[in-house]
Amino acid sequence: MEKDLANLTTLCYIEKDGCYLMMHRVSKKQDPNAGKWIGVGGHFQEGESPEECLLRDVKEETGLALTSWRFRGIVTFVSDEWGCEYMHLFTADGFEGELPEARMAACPEGELKWVEKEKVPDLNLWEGDRIFLRLLLEREDFFSLKLSYRGAELTEAKIF
């Protein structure tokens, strides 16, 4: 098994029929994202490119094979509790495979659900996630975003 790189991650918002595939993080113990809704993704393994990590993690968590995706931005998280993380943010609008109900509820990371894009802000999200989700909807260009947290509180957000 390859070594996970703790501070390099991917996150993908898979789109279908005006919805994003969201994950409700309710399955893992000791999860900094416990109870939050996020996209699909995970940690790089040693030697992986962002795209290789994206494709592997989406397949592992959902069973879907992405066929069309865009690298949308880099999000730098700085936290007094969890250190620093560099997240490679993607959207995807093409995939092969199906998500049966059993897979939606049985993902080891949490529960998967298709959520209408306009209803995503009503979910229990990190404050910083609200910022980059808005950027994904409003901008077409690549962006860099730095989010600083003290505990669970967002203390600073800078868009570059």
Could you tell me what each predicted segment is?
Residues M1-L21, F44:
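Conserved N-terminal beta-strand and adjoining loop/helix that marks the start
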Residues L21-M22, I38, T155:
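General beta-strand recognition
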Residues Q30-G35:
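A conserved beta-turn-beta hairpin within the catalytic core of GNAT-like acetyltransferases
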Residues W37-H43:
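Short glycine-enriched, charge-decorated loop/helix-capping segments at active-site entrances
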Residues F44-T67, F77-L136, E156-F160:
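Unchanged
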Residues L136-F160:
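Charged phosphate-binding loop/patch that engages nucleotide di/tri-phosphates or the phosphate backbone
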